[in-house]
Amino acid sequence: MCAQYCISFADVEKAHINIQDSIHLTPVLTSSILNQIAGRNLFFKCELFQKTGSFKIRGALNAIRGLIPDTPEEKPKAVVTHSSGNHGQALTYAAKLEGIPAYIVVPQTAPNCKKLAIQAYGASIVYCDPSDESREKVTQRIMQETEGILVHPNQEPAVIAGQGTIALEVLNQVPLVDALVVPVGGGGMVAGIAITIKALKPSVKVYAAEPSNADDCYQSKLKGELTPNLHPPETIADGVKSSIGLNTWPIIRDLVDDVFTVTEDEIKYATQLVWGRMKLLIEPTAGVALAAVLSQHFQTVSPEVKNVCIVLSGGNVDLTSLNWVGQAERPAPYQTVSV
């Protein structure tokens, strides 16, 4: 694996050893109805059943355990991060396991259920405006005040390596898999998965999926350079509002085969399909990946890509904000970038 990347496959292997005793081996489920709709064999990696309700515990726990020194006296005074909710919950849970205080910078617009969950796990919440600039500024201030160590939600190498353990499990659970489809925000999960897949089974495709309202990953691939969102994105998929960053971009640029964008209606439709057909209460961010596969444009993907694994990234749903339920129409075509 090229030395220009922030992690190697060896880091993912170490992460697997580091965290496997404290996370769930999440199931892979199928749906014959969704297979018929998609025209492919779909396999759903159910990270909504993971501890803290999303895949984020993998990276958070790997990062926290990497901070634990040989002597208790050297333990960090605190850990700090910014998060729309899921990473904040995961980091707080992981830090609590090791007896470390956690401070989470949360956008004021984050779902209420996620804010309450972060508090329930024992973190101190600090609010910020829903922009990358505000998050970074407030995070730096809290780090100075607490003398805490930053655990970035998607650019920290230990976090990326932890998320890559998803792919290790998928290759064992679905040995004939042809492709993985992963929702992308900051890119930690898709980068970790891409590193793992291309090291172990490079013929398997890795596709990223994101809202068209937050399409920095698509734009970056299109232009061949890192192109962050200029304005705070408006999307119901709150877990993928962040832009990809300096550590995830090179991996995405080189190892992710395609980036698909989907509309808000497509996300709503796909999310409700999973609710109705599979009886799984996923959050809209998890619906982004299925929305990509159900789009007409995905039909241009080779029919040889028959067995497709979709990562259902989380299930932390704010039930009080579901005023859009029943409003979505069937998906329409969307964009893709081929490399």
UniProtKB/Swiss-Prot annotation:
> Using the chain's own numbering, where are the disulfide bonds?
none
Q: Name one GO molecular function term.
A: ATP binding
Q: Which reaction does it catalyse?
A: L-serine = D-serine; D-serine = pyruvate + NH4(+); L-serine = pyruvate + NH4(+)
Where along the chain is Mg(2+) 1 bound?
A: E13
Active-site feature positions:
K56 (proton acceptor), S84 (proton acceptor)
Positions contributing to Ca(2+) 2 binding: T81
- For binding ATP, which residues are annotated in this chain's numbering? S31, S32, I33, K51, T52, Q89, Y121, K279, N316
Instruction: Briefly state the modifications made to the protein after translation.
Output: S-nitrosylated, leading to decrease the enzyme activity.
Q: Which residues bind pyridoxal 5'-phosphate?
A: N86, N154, G185, G186, G187, G188, M189, S313
Where is it found, in Gene Ontology cellular component terms? apical part of cell; cytoplasm; neuronal cell body
UniProt GO BP: D-serine biosynthetic process; L-serine metabolic process; pyruvate biosynthetic process; response to lipopolysaccharide; response to xenobiotic stimulus
Residues the entry annotates as binding Ca(2+) 1: P69
Q: How does it assemble?
A: Homodimer.
Question: Which protein are we looking at?
Answer: Serine racemase
The species is Mus musculus
Its taxonomic path starts at: Eukaryota, Metazoa, Chordata, Craniata, Vertebrata
Designated gene of the protein: Srr
